[in-house]
């Protein structure tokens, strides 16, 4: 991708000028942002980066664009308030690309989200070839060119008739193509009348036809007595033309065939005149129906909607395009596949009521030679299917027959309860999870159906489309379509998503993956002159892939777009054309523009906190000593999920353990889909064996906490104070004041969630929603309480000259000072300061928090626990949204949890956190099918010395160049996919 020269001097080029920005904590700042350049906004958490980038510039750019639309169009778009700013000039229409995955649509996939699937549907509709589901022959209709070529290839001079069958009455209705494949229906006997024959002949004369043909004889209309010899109870043909084979008759032949198709309901017949009177005439039949010429099955001609699982025309009728159905779940029916049939592998038949069925099953198995004393998973596919499907001739209905019988009995309550234990989402048996009807799956390009193409990863799809071998005509038709598909695949590859399959549900993607898909889609749209506002695009990216992301950003810039990137990644900051550093602190102590200029200028600026870290003046040091494994481990044997197959791993407890690896290497699969789910299933009595073969050491874990980035609440009522239970203490403080006692107020009167003291006009929301019918709903400040949420009588109660509403508007830092005499309140709030959230307001809506803020708020809640002993905490990229300075606080919080007896397991790419871990498990070596294995384990120093580890290569640079060496630890590389013994590791 070509690199344009950096455009970094605002005075030399067009720019966005902002004067007097006061959104949230911004301190009336003025700044400029150069057009057609990459501008990075940096600063500690809460310094005002998102307020500047999203709530000011994006909001105004989007608002102005929406205001330019008609009132009708505006009703379908989100209403955006004008930001609190004096003036913004030079702004372009804005596009926000956030790290949040808000997709919950079970039909949305990577292919549909990137528009690749739209082009695939078009490609298969235009050049796809349909193959018969019955006999495998290609399904086609006879075109005029193909017929002419086939006929003219015969020896010259042969004479023949061009005919079509005379239909004296309508045929039965043709088979419904949507139910294909169906054999052609037999013609019903026709009962003729003289009037019907006369009307048909008159109609033929009017249309210019003068001859009929039957059994080798030609009958002229000019001699009506000849027609008396025609037997109209047998097939009669209209003679369209008489020809002799030669190259000169090509055009005339095609015209005649076209007439037959039009008049003969899509069918044409060529009958060759025999050389001898006793010879049987040779006949060739052609038709324009889209059917299999071998077995007669009729199909629907491919068109884009046939390949859409969102359209009833193309969706599988059984699952309606979802790919799964609610059916009996085999994993619940046979939860422990290590059991044999004799030991009760089929769980429902171990119940007293149905034990007789187990006896019949074992009897059937013996007659079929199926071993009953072998583990179910060791049976062959044929043997398993025999047990499941049964054999009615042998008197055994099978497991499926058993559940079908129960379905007929589910009018009984106890049967419905019994069935519910074994129900679940199962792959649709009709489409095998492909979502499309059989006719769509019968269409192929280069031997692959559209569902087979979508099952490919981006990495597999690129060479497939690059190497497509097409005919000259197909290549001309598909040229532009293939160009769009290849371009989108290339961009997905360049943003580090080559391991994703095209049919991967977008609801299962991480926030970082979702953002990079949006980034790739934006680049493929080749939009110019737009303002792109990005929220930490490096999240979820391994350091190896960061350079590819930077090239994507430069590509967007080189198209003529302006990029405003909120970012903490040092490589991305150093690649920027222009840098703005906000601070100096968070919340009320932030919101000031500390520095604005080029990256080189920032490295020399003494006031920029980011610059001080980048030039090495400040750094996150390697801990002086690492904790050693104390002999307690969670051991997983035979882990299997997604790209992990048969993996053995030991995770030491009581340490900070980092799971690392390139994108798609299996980190989340190992930690969440295997470890977390298996531990939860073991604790709740579920089937943990569906995640691994053996699980040991979990008795050392008292609880498992997944601290993710999901919101703390779905309504504006949730806030930091209520989440940490600090608001309970604050309400008690207000209820204990003399004024509250005088009025008879209890702590409940100071709650906005229950009736009593809250404003009933807005029910404690502070806002009311007005339905505008034909316009978007408008949310207005409540006129009764003016947004305070409380009745005036409650607001009259003061503590230290502040009412409850004013307290909720305080930041955590302000509240700590305000409630200093109340240790119960400060004890709960102080943990927010420890995790770097002192800038949050107590009453700030939980829906406004970023994913990283929500995760750290949950971490703070866990830090308030009295007893963390034996708890395993799992974090997925906890550094999301964190500045270098905030990472120090996060690591301190982790150490506090571990000092309290907990274990901390993190999935992380940030090298500063990785080098601070006590133990590492590095996955890889690549993503997708080339991942799912353990590349290296041990201390960061050990992994850094492993030549097979991509993480190790970058970690070695971080340990040596930025942090004063590797502490002299020597180690040997550990073999992949082995269970290491942490006790033998050298740790200083």
Task: Locate the predicted segments by residue.
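Conserved phosphate-binding elements of NTP-dependent enzyme cores
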Residues: 1-988
């Amino acid at each position: 991708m070509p690199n344009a020269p950096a455009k970094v001097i605002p005075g030399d080029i067009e720019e966005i000028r902002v004067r007097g920005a006061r959104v949230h904590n911004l301190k009336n700042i003025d700044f400029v942002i150069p057009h057609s350049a990459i501008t990075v906004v940096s600063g500690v958490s809460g310094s005002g980066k998102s307020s500047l980038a999203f709530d000011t510039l994006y909001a105004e750019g989007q608002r102005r664009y929406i205001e330019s639309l008609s009132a009708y169009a505006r009703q379908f778009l989100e209403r955006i308030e004008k930001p609190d700013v004096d003036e913004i000039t030079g702004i372009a229409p804005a596009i926000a690309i956030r790290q949040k995955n808000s997709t919950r649509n079970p039909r949305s996939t990577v292919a549909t989200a990137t528009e690749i699937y739209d082009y695939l549907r078009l490609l298969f509709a235009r050049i796809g070839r349909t193959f018969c589901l019955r006999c495998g022959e290609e399904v086609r209709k006879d075109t005029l060119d193909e017929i002419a070529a086939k006929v003219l290839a015969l020896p010259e001079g042969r004479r023949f008739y061009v005919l079509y069958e005379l239909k004296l009455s309508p045929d039965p209705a043709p088979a419904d193509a949507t139910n294909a494949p169906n054999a052609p229906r037999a013609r019903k006997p026709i009962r003729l009348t003289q009037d019907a024959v006369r009307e048909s002949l008159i109609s033929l004369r009017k249309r210019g036809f003068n001859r009929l043909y039957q059994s080798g004889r030609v009958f002229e209309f000019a001699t009506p007595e000849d027609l008396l010899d025609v037997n109209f109870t047998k097939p009669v043909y209209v003679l369209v033309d008489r020809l002799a084979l030669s190259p000169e008759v090509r055009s005339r032949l095609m015209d005649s065939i076209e007439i037959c198709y039009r008049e003969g309901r899509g069918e044409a017949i060529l009958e060759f005149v025999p050389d001898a009177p006793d010879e049987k005439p040779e006949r060739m039949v052609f038709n324009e129906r889209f059917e299999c010429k071998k077995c007669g099955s009729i199909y629907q001609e491919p068109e884009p909607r046939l390949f859409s699982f969102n359209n009833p025309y193309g969706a599988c009728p059984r699952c309606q395009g979802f790919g799964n159905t609610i059916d009996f779940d085999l994993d619940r029916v046979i939860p422990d596949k290590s059991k044999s049939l004799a030991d009760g592998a089929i769980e429902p038949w171990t119940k007293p009521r149905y034990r007789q069925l187990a006896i019949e099953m074992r009897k059937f198995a013996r007659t079929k030679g199926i071993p009953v004393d072998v583990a179910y998973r060791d049976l062959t596919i044929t043997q398993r299917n025999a047990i499941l499907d049964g054999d009615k001739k042998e008197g055994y209905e099978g497991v499926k027959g058993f559940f079908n019988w129960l379905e007929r009995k589910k009018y009984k309550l106890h049967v419905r309860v019994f069935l519910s234990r074994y129900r679940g989402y199962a792959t649709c048996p009709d489409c095998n999870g492909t979502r499309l009807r059989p006719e769509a799956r019968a269409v192929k390009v280069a031997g692959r159906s559209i569902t087979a193409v979508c099952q490919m990863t981006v990495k597999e799809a690129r060479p497939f489309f690059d190497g497509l071998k097409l005919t000259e005509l197909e290549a001309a038709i598909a040229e532009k379509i293939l160009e769009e598909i290849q371009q989108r695949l290339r961009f997905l590859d360049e943003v580090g998503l080559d391991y994703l399959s095209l049919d991967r549900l977008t609801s299962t993607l991480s926030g970082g993956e979702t953002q990079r898909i949006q980034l790739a889609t934006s680049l493929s749209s080749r939009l110019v002159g737009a303002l792109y506002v990005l929220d930490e695009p490096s999240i979820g990216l391994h350091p190896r892939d960061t350079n590819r992301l930077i090239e994507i950003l430069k590509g967007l810039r080189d198209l003529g777009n302006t990029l405003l990137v909120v970012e903490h990644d040092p490589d991305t900051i150093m690649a920027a054309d222009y840098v703005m550093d906000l601070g100096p602190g968070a919340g009320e102590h932030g919101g000031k523009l500390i520095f604005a200029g080029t990256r080189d200028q920032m490295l020399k600026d003494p006031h920029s906190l980011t610059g001080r870290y980048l030039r090495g003046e400040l750094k996150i040091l390697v801990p002086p000593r690492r904790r050693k494994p104390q002999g307690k481990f969670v051991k997983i044997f035979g882990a299997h999920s997604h790209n992990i197959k048969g993996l053995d791993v030991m995770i030491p407890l009581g340490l900070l353990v980092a799971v690392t690896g390139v994108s798609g290497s299996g980190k989340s699969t190992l930690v969440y889909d295997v470890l977390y789910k298996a531990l939860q299933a073991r604790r709740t009595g579920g089937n943990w064996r569906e995640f691994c073969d053996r699980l040991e050491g979990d008795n050392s874990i008292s609880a498992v906490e997944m601290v993710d980035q999901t919101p703390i609440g779905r309504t504006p009522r949730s806030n930091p104070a209520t989440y940490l239970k600090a608001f309970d203490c604050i309400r008690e403080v207000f209820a204990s004041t003399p004024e509250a006692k005088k009025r008879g107020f209890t702590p409940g009167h100071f709650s906005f969630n229950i009736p009593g003291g809250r404003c009933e006009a807005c029910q404690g929301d502070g806002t009311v929603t007005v339905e505008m019918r034909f316009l978007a709903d408008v949310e207005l400040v409540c006129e009764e309480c003016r947004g305070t949420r409380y009745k005036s009588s409650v607001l009259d109660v003061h503590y230290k000259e502040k009412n409850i509403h004013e307290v909720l508007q305080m930041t955590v830092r302000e509240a700590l000072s305000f409630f200093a005499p109340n240790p119960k309140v400060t004890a709960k709030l102080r943990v927010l300061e420890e995790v770097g959230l002192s800038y949050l307001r107590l009453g700030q809506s939980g829906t406004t928090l970023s994913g990283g803020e929500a995760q750290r708020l949950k971490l703070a809640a866990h830090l308030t626990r009295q007893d963390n002993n034996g708890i395993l905490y799992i974090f997925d990229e906890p550094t999301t949204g964190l500045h270098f300075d905030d990472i120090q606080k996060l690591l301190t919080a982790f150490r506090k949890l571990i000092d309290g007896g907990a274990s901390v397991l993190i999935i992380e790419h940030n090298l500063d956190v990785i080098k601070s871990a006590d133990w590492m498990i590095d996955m890889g070596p690549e993503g997708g099918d080339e991942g799912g294995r353990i590349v290296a384990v041990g201390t960061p120093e050990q992994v850094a010395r492993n030549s097979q580890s991509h993480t190790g290569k970058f970690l070695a640079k971080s340990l040596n160049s930025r942090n004063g060496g590797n502490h002299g630890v020597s180690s040997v590389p550990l073999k992949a996919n082995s269970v290491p013994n942490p006790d033998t590791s050298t740790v200083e």
